[in-house]
C-alpha cells in the first residue's frame, strides 16, 4: 500500500488490505538497514485474525522515498504522522532493535493512544561500537558481514533454519545489500546518539513485552535491566539459544509471545 506523507511516497505493508478503522491496529517498525519484509510472517498472522497490520518502510528504506531520517526523534515524529494520516485513534506498536527505540519514543508521545508495546532486542542506551560505525560509513561490505555475524547466536551461525529451504545468515546479508549504504550508516548513528530511551520508557503506561535472545551479542542481556526497570507495566520473555535476529532465529516463539501479549 502506497500513500503520500509530507509530499513523499511512503510504503506500508498491509497484506493487501485496506485499513479498517473499526478494527484494532498493529504497527510494525523495522530495525537499522532493513524494511517491512522482516515482519511478513507476523503481519500475515494478525491480518488473518482481523487486525489492521501496518508494517512500514521508514523514509529511504525499502519502497519509501527518502531522505533518510537522522534521529530516533525524527523517526518517531514521522511514525506519528503516518498513524495520523491513516486515521488511527489507537495502535499497538512492535519494534525491533532501532525500531524498538522508535517504539519507545512514539509510545511516550502518544500516551493512551498506544494499547500495547513490544520491544524486541532492545536496550537503552543502544551504543554502537566505533569499528561498526567506521564500517557502515566506509566499508559497507564489511559492515554487512560484521552485523550479520554478531546478529545471530553462535549456534545459529553454524546453519539450520526453522523455515525449510532458507539459510538465515544469507537472508540477512541480502537484506542489508538491498538497502542503501547511507540508510544503514544513518540508522546506526541514530541508535548511538539516542539518549532519551529511559525517560521515554518511564512515560509509557501501556502493557509492554520485552523479547530478548539469551545469546544476543549486539544488545546483550546484561544491558536490558535499566530499560525493564523504567517500564511500569512490562514483562520480559527470554528466548533460549537466540541472538539479536529473533524473528528469523525463532519465529514461532516470537509469534507465540505476540499472540499472548496482544490477543
Where do the protein language model's features map onto the residues?
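Flexible "cap/lid" loop of the alpha/beta hydrolase fold
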Residues: 101-146
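Active-site loop/oxyanion-hole signature of alpha/beta-hydrolase fold enzymes
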Residues: 8, 15, 40-44, 48, ...
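Short beta-strand/loop motif that positions the catalytic acidic residue
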Residues: 204, 210-212, 216
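Conserved alpha/beta-hydrolase catalytic His-Asp/Glu region
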Residues: 134-203
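Short beta-strand element of the alpha/beta-hydrolase
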Residues: 23-31
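Catalytic histidine-centered segment of alpha/beta-hydrolase-like enzymes
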Residues: 242-255
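Catalytic histidine neighborhood in serine/cysteine hydrolases
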Residues: 225-244
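Active-site glycine-rich loops that stabilize anionic/oxyanionic intermediates
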Residues: 31-34, 97
Amino acid at each position: 500500500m502506497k500513500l503520500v506523507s509530507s509530499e513523499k511516497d511512503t510504503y506500508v505493508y498491509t497484506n493487501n488490505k485496506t485499513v479498517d478503522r473499526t478494527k484494532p491496529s498493529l504497527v510494525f517498525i523495522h530495525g537499522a538497514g532493513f524494511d517491512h519484509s522482516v515482519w511478513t510472517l507476523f503481519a500475515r498472522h494478525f491480518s488473518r485474525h482481523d487486525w489492521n497490520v501496518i508494517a512500514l518502510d521508514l523514509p529511504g528504506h525499502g519502497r519509501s522515498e527518502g531522505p533518510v531520517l537522522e534521529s530516533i526523534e525524527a523517526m518517531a515524529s514521522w511514525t506519528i504522522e503516518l498513524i495520523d494520516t491513516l486515521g488511527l485513534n489507537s495502535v499497538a506498536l512492535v519494534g525491533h532493535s532501532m525500531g524498538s527505540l522508535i517504539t519507545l519514543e512514539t509510545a511516550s508521545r502518544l500516551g493512551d493512544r498506544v494499547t500495547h508495546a513490544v520491544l524486541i532486542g532492545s536496550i537503552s542506551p543502544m551504543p554502537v561500537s566505533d569499528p561498526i560505525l567506521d564500517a557502515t560509513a566506509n566499508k559497507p561490505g564489511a559492515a554487512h558481514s560484521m552485523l550479520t555475524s554478531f546478529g545471530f547466536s553462535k549456534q545459529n551461525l553454524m546453519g539450520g533454519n526453522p523455515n525449510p529451504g532458507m539459510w538465515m545468515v544469507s537472508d540477512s546479508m541480502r537484506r542489508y545489500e538491498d538497502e542503501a549504504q547511507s540508510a544503514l550508516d544513518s540508522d546506526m548513528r541514530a541508535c548511538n546518539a539516542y539518549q532519551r530511551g529511559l525517560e521515554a520508557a518511564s512515560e509509557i503506561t501501556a502493557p509492554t513485552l520485552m523479547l530478548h535472545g539469551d545469546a544476543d551479542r549486539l544488545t546483550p542481556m546484561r544491558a536490558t535491566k535499566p530499560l525493564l526497570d523504567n517500564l511500569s507495566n512490562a514483562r520480559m520473555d527470554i528466548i533460549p539459544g537466540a541472538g539479536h535476529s529473533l524473528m528469523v532465529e525463532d519465529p514461532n516463539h516470537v509469534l507465540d509471545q505476540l499472540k499472548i501479549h496482544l490477543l
